[in-house]
Amino acid sequence: MNNNKTLLALCLGAGLLASSNTYAFWFGSSGYTQTQYPVVLAHGMLGFDSILGVDYWYGIPAALRRDGASVYITEVSQLNTSEARGEELLAQVEEIVAISGKPKVNLIGHSHGGPTIRYVAAVSPNLIASATSVGAPHKGSATADFIRQVPPGSAGETLLAGIVNGLGTLINFLSGSSSTSPQNALGALESLNSEGAARFNAKFPQGIPTTACGEGAYSVNGVRYYSWSGTSPVTNIIDPSDLLLGATALTFNGEANDGLVGRCSSRMGKVIRDNYRMNHLDEVNQTLGLTSLFETDPVTVYRQHANRLKNDGL
């Protein structure tokens, strides 16, 4: 974040915390989501904080704050390697620690935000109380592997990268992002395919299962690791994004997935659940809350997890 937007964002976070405390004083707060350390949300590929009044984490921050959580929303490069995004996130975490007065934070990362928060937890575990991934491709994505079949250096790759980088630039502009990192679609692709994920895991193995579909270490270097994900690409027929995720799900050749991430690839640390009736966007309550009528509300899942962190002393 640049200095001006950083100061504004963090001051707003502090103000919202004060507002939540005022709300609690007048109307009462259960304290259900009141974690010891701030909750810091990290978006995925092509993510943002808010665009044209629509939040990436739709309805989630307000629901967490309502019962006591201090919540900060970060924004990093829409398209880049896990390491580059991690460095951007680390700088913001350091600012949040400074302004909140708390020595650590609870990181929650969706999609590519999962490897991003893992990088921060690995290089600066002293700043991190917990790292939670939601629908994150820790062992790569079959969709990324499918796209990677486009020959490197080919005209097709150049065209595809140009289109995706353009989309990333547009999202960066519309969200008012302070990230000045260039859009790097090919870097993101290399981080999210199976081979790139394996290289990343070799450098940063914390919380990653050593078996094909097991659990990882629950705690490493004082950082607690958690994860959850969905396995239903199509969940609501009136949500237009379900059509896209239903199509991308075909790249998994029958493996359970959320449309972009396989069930086993999503597992890290303590697995809360890996088969919610949710697709990749449902996991952040998108599109606009159009999720399955036959599954727990995604917002409730985040509230339950905040309570879990609270009960774990985090």
Predicted regions mapped to residue ranges:
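N-terminal signal peptide c-region/cleavage motif recognized by signal peptidases
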Residues: 19-21
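C-terminal catalytic-base region of ester-bond hydrolases, centering on the histidine
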Residues: 210-314
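Solvent-exposed loop/turn segments at secondary-structure junctions
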Residues: 44-48, 77-81, 111-115, 136-141, ...
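Serine-dependent carboxylesterase/thioesterase catalytic core
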Residues: 43, 71, 87-198, 258
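Serine-hydrolase catalytic core
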Residues: 178-234
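Bacterial N-terminal signal peptides that target proteins for export
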Residues: 1-8
